[in-house]
Each structure stands twice: as C-alpha cells, then as structure tokens.
Amino acid sequence: MARDYYAILGVERDATDNEIKKAYRKLARKYHPDVNDTEEAAEKFSKISIAQEVLLDAEKRRIVDMGGDPMAQGGGDAGYGAGGGLGDIFEAFFGGGGGSRGPRSRVQPGSDALLRTTLTLEEAYLGTKKPITIDTAILCDRCEGTGSKSKSKPNVCSTCNGSGEIQQMQRSFLGNVMTSSPCPTCRGTGEVIPDPCDKCGGDGRVRTQRDLIVNVPAGIADGMRIRMAGQGEVGPGGGPAGDLYIEVMMQQHPVFQREGNDLHMSVHVPMVDAALGATTSVESLSGDAIDFEIPAGVQPAETIVIEGKGMPQLRGEGFGNMIAHVDVSIPTQLDEKSKELLNKLRDHRSDESSVRTADDSDDSLFGRLRNRFRR
C-alpha cells in the first residue's frame, strides 16, 4: 500500500512547496537525532525527510497524486540527507542555511507596476487613448545601466572573495554550526563597482516620471487590466524592465447601468403614452439618437429590449442589448381640461371597477405568495 506522504507531514494535498517545507521544519525540530535520540524519533525523522523529498519533487509528487509510491519504484530510503536534513534545520533557526548558495546576479529583472485609471462609459464604449503619468525606475543614461562612471566591469568583492556570502561560527543546541549570510559589502552579488556612477549611485537605474499613452480597447469593463509589456520598472544593475498593468475603474453613468455587455436604463412613460403607445428616443454612448417604440398597453416595470445597442464585445464582434425599464408616470396635478377628459374616460369604461377581489392566478401577487407557502 502506498504511503501517505501528505499525512506524514500533516499537510493538505494542495499544499505549496513553502507549506511543505514549513511543516517539515516544524517536525524536524522535534524529531532530529541531535534533539531526540530515541529510536522512535529516528524512525519518524527518516519518514518526514523522505516525505519532504517526495513532495518537493514534481515528478515524484505526480506519482503520489496518482496513487503510487515513487520510493517503492527504486527510490529507496532517503535517510537524514533527503530533502534537506541538517541544512533545513540550520535554515529554520539561523535563516541562512548550512550550505553555500553562491552569489546572486548583480543584474536583476525589474518589478511589475500597477496603475489605476478612471474611464467614462463613453470611453469604454468607443475605446480611447488615455494619457497617464507613472513614477518608475528607468535605465541610468549616464552609465547606461553599468553602475560605473567609466562603464567598466565590476571587481570581485574582497570581503567575500566573490562568493556573495560570509560565513561565521555560531553556537546552538546542535553544537557549533557554520552559518552563511549575504555579504554586506556586495549585497550578495560577489561583485563591487570601484567607481560608482554619481547619478545612480551604482544601481544602474534612476527614478523619474514618465508620460505614456494607453490604448484602451472598446468594450473594456470595470476591474479589467491592460498589460503594457516592458513598461514597468527597470531592474537593479540595468536589468530588463517588468510590465506595467493599467487597472480600469469605471465612472457611474447618469443614464445607463452596465451588466455584462447589456446597458440598462429607466424610461419614464406618460400614462397616456403607456396606454396608447408612442415613439421615444435616447442618446446613445456614441452620441447618436436611438428611436424605439413604446408598445400600447405597456405596464410598469416591463422591459423593452433594443437589440444590438449595448456595449461592444471586447476584441470580438457584435454588441449587447439596450434594455429599457418602463416607469409609468401618473400625473399628480391636473388642470380642469385633463380632469374632464379622464372623467369621460372613466365613465366610458365604467364596467372596470377599482374594487376587486384578490386575483388568485399563479402570476398574481396573491398567487405567488400562495405558491411560496405551499413549498
């Protein structure tokens, strides 16, 4: 039967590498032979070491997730050296680990940047070119990213002899241990610039403000991001720039409310137009007038769908719909002529009484309440 390596470390099956390492270190502090010399602890430490090795290896972990046991397929037992052992113990307590990692490159990739910009619904409908200003790091034009006044190559750090690390002996409950930490002189790169640029201080980059133009595609929606490749910050030592992301925030529109690619609006219909029908219009986001019909007998809260007059499909073809929500306006003040006409209408339709029994149809208010309580 395959061993449950997740259970051995006490982690979930979707645990990240960092979560696996953290669980291993926690158990290693308890079961390492230097702190617990029992046979049971030695066996437990061997198991957690093997479990860490397996779960940190992508191929072995895949076998485990398929129900197999990679250590039963010629993998053997890892013992104390599997997946870290003492090195991980040292790292857990002293931060630098027990072994040398070597110098890191002085030239590093730049960071991505995020900027938020506000758009009107009209701009999102038509697409636009949006000017922005960002505070960012750019390549130093004086040293061209080398960090050196003379643009010469850096020298080997004399403090760490190019290793990027310094080592020192520390006492612990494990005895005397040799720990490594980044060299403070070269900051872990193993190199120093003998004549730092007086503009960037040897960093190879300077901070400045840049003006850019963002191409906003038609149909973009609130919360979406536009990626501008290579427009982020230049990295230390003149490393390649990261990307710039522009996050869109939409202003509230006085007429339309967007849902997906549909545009919703409220249309106020006079009582007479609701009864007889009418033609009305609304100004679209492009500035054109859109005419549409109010059908005779339309009721309050009914919707009228105007096909193809909504938002454009982002990077595609077609448009959403415009949806008008009917609000029938009942007059509150009437002149004598209007009262006379309405009284004549009421007399003409005298067979319609305002006193009604409760409508018991399924579509009525009482019908809906009845059906709900029957559930």
Swiss-Prot record:
InterPro entries for the chain: DnaJ, DnaJ_C, DnaJ_domain, HSP40/DnaJ_pept-bd, HSP_DnaJ_Cys-rich_dom, HSP_DnaJ_Cys-rich_dom_sf, J_dom_sf
Keyword Protein biosynthesis: no
Zinc finger residue extent: CR-type: 127-209
Binding residue positions for Zn(2+) 2: 157, 160, 183, 186
GO MF, one example: zinc ion binding
UniProt remark on cofactor binding: Binds 2 Zn(2+) ions per monomer.
Top-level taxonomic group: Bacteria
HAMAP family noted in UniProt: DnaJ
Subunit structure: Homodimer.
Name of the molecule in the record: Chaperone protein DnaJ 1
Organism: Corynebacterium diphtheriae (strain ATCC 700971 / NCTC 13129 / Biotype gravis)
Lineage, broadest ranks: Bacteria, Bacillati, Actinomycetota, Actinomycetes, Mycobacteriales
Gene: dnaJ1
